[in-house]
Amino acid sequence: TTRLVGSEMCIRDSYDAEVYRSAFDEAMKNDLNHWVSNQTDGMIDKLLEQAPGERTMLYLVNAVCFDAKWEKPYEKENIQKGAVFTAADGTRQTADLLWSQESLYLSDDNTTGFMKYYDGGRYAFVGLLPNEGVSIADYVAGLTGGKLHALLNDPQHGTVEAAIPRFKASSSLELSDALKAMGVTDAFDSTAADLRAMGGAPNDQLYVSAVLHKTYLELDENGTKAAAVTAVVTEAACAAPTEVHRVVLDRPFVYMIVDTHANLPLFLGTVTQMDG
């Protein structure tokens, strides 16, 4: 027999979550992928590539979907078609740049950037362009939570001539190693994990065997669509403008979608080249 944390009612009431019981077979894989597609408006159509292994006991799946229009939409005359984007490997690629005038400028010793609001004013796109001579890899390697927090907490009011390329970004990651490097180790250890409250057969020791994460983001003149899905796989072991700034994202950059009320990023990634 198995039991779930607290009860199914508690999970639904406290976390607005859904609970499903199913045989872990090909049909379950298809059902889970269908759920992911529905929850992300089709932006992520598949999370699992293969049916669960025979020792798999539980999937915890979290989906985030973001679809917002710009507070200040782009007009046709704001779109520069056929512009040049210099990729991380130095190749020159074609991009369509979306030009706008923004009022929040971000900067520190290694980057310049800006914030552009979505309709409603709570969420904003943030573009960060490493200084000339600083590679995107080096910049990201030195980017800490503290540095991001400092940037987002201290925007400068001023005129920013900003340009964002139309782009699409997607990723598929297995996060176990990254989480272990951050100190989350016991949950992955079949002898140290204590997940008894989550259930399982009496003789089974539950532990986390994998953390799967997929994202998709699409940005154009209308706004941004983004989605993220994470699955935890549990197995049994046995002021007035005073200066004009210019930030053109025509080479590798960091992007974020930020909740400006909490100053926390919902999505964060890099663009190092244009599609195709």
Where are these regions (language model features)?
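Single conserved hydrophobic/aromatic residue that forms the stacking wall/gate
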Residues: 1-6, 10-11
